Amino acid sequence: MSVPVAPKKSCYTQLRDNRNAARNNNESILSLGDTNANQIMLEVSSSHDESKTCDLGDEIGNTNSSEPENRTHFHKEFHQLQGFGKGSQAGSASLKDFRLSSTIQRELNEEHTVERGTDSLQTTRSIQGPSLSSWRNVMSEASLDVLAKRDAEIPRHVPKDKLAKTLDNEELRRHSLERASSSVAAVGSLTPQHPQPLSLDSREARGQIPGGGEGPQKTLPDHAVPAAFPATDSTSEGKSVRHPKPSTSESKQSTPSETQTVGAHVLQVCSEHTSHSAHPEPALNLTLASKEIPSKLEAQLGQGKGEAKLDLKYVPPRRVEQEGKAAQEGYLGCHKEENLSALEGRDPCGEAHPEATDALGHLLNSDLHHLGVGRGNCEEKRGVNPGEQDSLHTTPKQGSASLGGADNQPTGKISPCAGEKLGERTSSSFSPGDSHVAFIPNNLTDSKPLDVIEEERRLGSGNKDSVMVLVFNPSVGENKTEVPEPLDPQSGRSEARESKEVTTSVAENRNLLENADKIESTSARADSVLNIPAPLHPETTVNMTYQPTTPSSSFQDVSVFGMDAGSPLVVPPPTDSARLLNTSPKVPDKNTCPSGIPKPVFTHSKDTPSSQEGMENYQVEKTEERTETKPIIMPKPKHVRPKIITYIRRNPQALGQVDASLVPVGLPYAPPTCTMPLPHEEKAAGGDLKPSANLYEKFKPDLQKPRVFSSGLMVSGIKPPGHPFSQMSEKFLQEVTDHPGKEEFCSPPYAHYEVPPTFYRSAMLLKPQLGLGAMSRLPSAKSRILIASQRSSASAIHPPGPITTATSLYSSDPSADLKKASSSNAAKSNLPKSGLRPPGYSRLPAAKLAAFGFVRSSSVSSVSSTQSGDSAQPEQGRPATRSTFGNEEQPVLKASLPSKDTPKGAGRVAPPASSSVTAPRRSLLPAPKSTSTPAGTKKDAQKDQDTNKPAVSSPKRVAASTTKLHSPGYPKQRTAAARNGFPPKPDPQAREAERQLVLRLKERCEQQTRQLGVAQGELKRAICGFDALAVATQHFFRKNESALVKEKELSIELANIRDEVAFHTAKCEKLQKEKEELERRFEDEVKRLGWQQQAELQELEERLQLQFEAEMARLQEEHGDQLLSIRCQHQEQVEDLTASHDAALLEMENNHTVAITILQDDHDHKVQELMSTHELEKKELEENFEKLRLSLQDQVDTLTFQSQSLRDRARRFEEALRKNTEEQLEIALAPYQHLEEDMKSLKQVLEMKNQQIHEQEKKILELEKLAEKNIILEEKIQVLQQQNEDLKARIDQNTVVTRQLSEENANLQEYVEKETQEKKRLSRTNEELLWKLQTGDPTSPIKLSPTSPVYRGSSSGPSSPARVSTTPR
């Protein structure tokens, strides 16, 4: 598609600088409003902004390090998606690190941002060519994938149901990853846009991102972003479909760790999405991109890097908002120029930075931030995961939002860090979506004091991001002039709305924290998705493209976009208002009413649940969209199963999630059909993008069939396939037809009907998606109400194009359709939407329906809540809305509801009508439900409704109870009165007959009176609804006109861009030709010079050869002469040397002879002297020897004589001594003669004693040895005893552990068995639903009992898409 632009370190540096600058600008300002709309600057967010900015700085630093990781995922895909992906990856990695470094909340926000940023970047890449179309498709698909992935990851601590749903979501994710790769990219961008403090907002942002992705893809000129912002909300609702994250919501609520996982997973998902979008989505994106890419590719390639840098350049939200306003006013011209300038400046990194400071510079920053921030966002997302945990723990709802709204997480984190993070994130990667979010928050801030402020802070961060997005969008506008901006506004708006919604939900639904968390995260995500629609103005054109594909969905989106286009940045505040109007508490209606119609900011507590649910629904729709987009996944039961998960039933908001899961089941929403089917078509076509018309025709049956145009859908203003598209839609259709590449725009139908996905989701949820079982299971009355309110908000989003549709939808609203058979389609759609059992399920026993969560009374409430969902978008107002629409008994509620409806109507045109119709619908629904639904089911539904809104009794239940009480009770009283009144005098028979007649007449009168009262009440409600519808229609018409004007401007700008591209292309071709000519000349000259050189070389060689030969001869002669002379000289020298040598030899010989003679003489003389001296000495020695011998002989003789004499004397002396001693001995020994015997006896005794002693010693030794052995043995015994004790203790411990493990094993086996049974049941339900969907006649209404309000509505009402959609069930 486009050449991937590798993010530069300088880009990261720029991003860091931009973020710091953004923090400086954003520290004091947390813009909560659209740039065009009231800018609600939350100073409170300043800390968050600072934190965010700092974190962004860190993030950027980290991005450099982490960038490889994200870039690894995204780079592969980003190569296809374009250079933006890389920046996105790097940014996301950096953001991730930054997120880690920042506070956990800030991390949550960053995670959202990272996810959104990466997706956005990816989307931007994919969409660079077909900026709007590509953006939208990429964004929608990316968001879908991201959501799917996020869903897959989010179910961290999710119950089995949640896990099952998560698994299905993951499957959807896998399918949609391929489809929504581009969408993920878009989502990534949007995600950075919506990393608002509120994690829910983040999720909304994410949810919105798909829509935003569509929106940005469709973003015509960046200036359209203002309108797109409101549209973003619409898209965000549509994107909420993407909320196949019901499990994600619950997962969020389940655990921050889940959130973390989700965040990381989302990054991966973004990568996968990016790759998918790069590959599968390229079919759409490439088609769109292929057309626009040629022109934009060059600019984007040049600018892609610049854009990455722009991403690095973070523009302060306030600046971005302020400049965004200015830019929106001068968006077309200035934005582009600034984009270019910013891009150019950003390429140098230093130049763009100052420009980023400028409004357009900021816009460029926003756009680039989309890309660069995308990287940062990915990082942020990773980092956010930990942050998300804190966010989840700190703010359960926000935590949820952080999961779902990793993109919007900064909002969830609006804590002290949230402000900083908002600023940073806004600066970094939230600029696209956040810019709008900031705008939306203004209205929200006005409407909501606390929650709204909190939400606004989140939105404010989102707005900052949105502003940044605006800045970024311009740069993208250059590269993807149309894509980034729309993404930004839409994302911002939907995020803002979702933030509001989340805030309200947080404040109001603290008790619903789990559900709210899930739903809010889903809503946040939806908002994220919706935020993406913020660029609906740009998207408006794109929406048109989508519209052809999914007329209803497209139309709704188109209307929304038209409204958005009509109301630029100003629209976002209206969007907030519209959200508020869409039962302003119903924050999801932010997207629903992206139109410039200001909606009163009602408490969003109610709105939050609805919006959350709506967001979830959108996300679900998105999931479905993804499912459809990928391999026509919507029919896949896997997706349905996860959606069917019963846990959703527990959570009203989970309903939306379940809807998301349901959507993939193959209940093609109009949006999914448009968004995903188109991608599927394109994918199926093998990357060939068919014209939107072809796609529309192709998917028309799906749109008509699976697309259950529930009352919510109708209310949302989504035109059924039959409904004509709004002007903008038509234009988009034309564009789509003209530009198959724009089918991407179509592929995200939500973009057209941001809310419709929610409506479809609700309708589908209630009707076919989960098969009623899962749907009713998932949505309690409260959930259904939320769904209805979300639908209504979605319808509010859709009003621009689908005002007519809205009218038909409203006429088909449960009140009108259910009451009046004429609105059969609406009744059908309302039934599923309101939670009524689908026609097929109406036959199911009440117990079964109740088990599924489909209670007649509840569904009636849901139907009315579809409209009342608009007015009762706040969870509070859900029951009230039902009673208001369905029951005139609650005048106060009615009054509030009409006002809500009026805002709704204003926002979505259809909602007012739906509200008026809703009352009749409710009144009708209660009776039919009571008739068709067992009391138990009704009671369950009523209980759900009562639980949600005990004050407001469901109209059906009230009507049924009233009717039942009066019919049986009053008639009896009247009979008694008749008896008393008639005198007993007449004949008893006559009296009896008269009494009976009177009683019958009275009963008939009572019935007629009641009917008349009901009809009057319905008439009043219908009048109010039509008034609201008229106001909304006018509003949307005006908005549509403004959108058309903007569309024209955008088309002009696009034409200019194309002209420029063509000019540059021609110039490039010319230069190429010149280059080729010069190359040819050069080659010829080189050849000529080569030949010339060769000739010269040969000539030179010959000349040198001759010279060499001559020189050789001369040198040889000289050498010969020299040799001769040298030889002569040598000979002479030899002769001389020989003569001198001979003379020397003779002289030496003579000298030698003389010397020898002298030496011989000396030797002889010395020998003679030595001989004479020797002889003399010998003689002397002989003489001396003789003398000595003689003297010694004399001495020897003398001594011999003396020794003999001495021997004789000694012998004599010895003899004398011996004799003497013998005598003495005899005398002395006489007394001792017996001593010897005594000695012998003593010796014997001693020997005996010695033997005894030896024996004793031996025994002692043996005993000592034994003692030693005993000591050793005792020690060994002690050791063995200790060992034995240790072993016993271990045995005891092992026994305990074994018991515990066995118990755990048993429990696990039971759990597995239960899980298996549940899976089987869900599979059966899924198969049943799939069978019903497959076998259901798309054109014929379901055969309901003639008394069934749905049946009557469908039979009497004109064949509307709603009826068609109802039939698929």
Swiss-Prot record:
Residues 801-890 are annotated as: Sufficient for interaction with KIF2C. It is found in: Cytoplasm, Cytoskeleton. Residues 991-1335 form a coiled coil. Residues 801-1150 are annotated as: Localization to the growing distal tip of microtubules. Detected in embryonic stem cells differentiating to cardiomyocytes. InterPro entries: MTUS1/CCDC69 (IPR051293). Residues 937-947 have a biased composition (Basic and acidic residues). Residues 180-262, 374-442, 477-509, 582-627, 791-839, 861-992, 1331-1369 are annotated as: Disordered. Keywords: Coiled coil, Cytoplasm, Cytoskeleton, Microtubule. One of its GO terms (cellular component) is intercellular bridge. Residues 246-262, 392-401, 804-814 have a biased composition (Polar residues). Residues 641-980 are annotated as: Mediates interaction with MAPRE1. One of its GO terms (molecular function) is microtubule binding. Residues 821-834, 1348-1369 have a biased composition (Low complexity). It comes from the Eukaryota. PANTHER family: MICROTUBULE-ASSOCIATED TUMOR SUPPRESSOR CANDIDATE 2 (PTHR24200:SF14), TOUCAN, ISOFORM A (PTHR24200). Homodimer. Interacts with KIF2C and MAPRE1; the interaction is direct and probably targets MTUS2 and KIF2C to microtubules. Binds microtubules. Together with MAPRE1 may target the microtubule depolymerase KIF2C to the plus-end of microtubules. May regulate the dynamics of microtubules at their growing distal tip. In the C-terminal section; belongs to the MTUS1 family. This is Microtubule-associated tumor suppressor candidate 2. It comes from Homo sapiens. The gene is MTUS2.
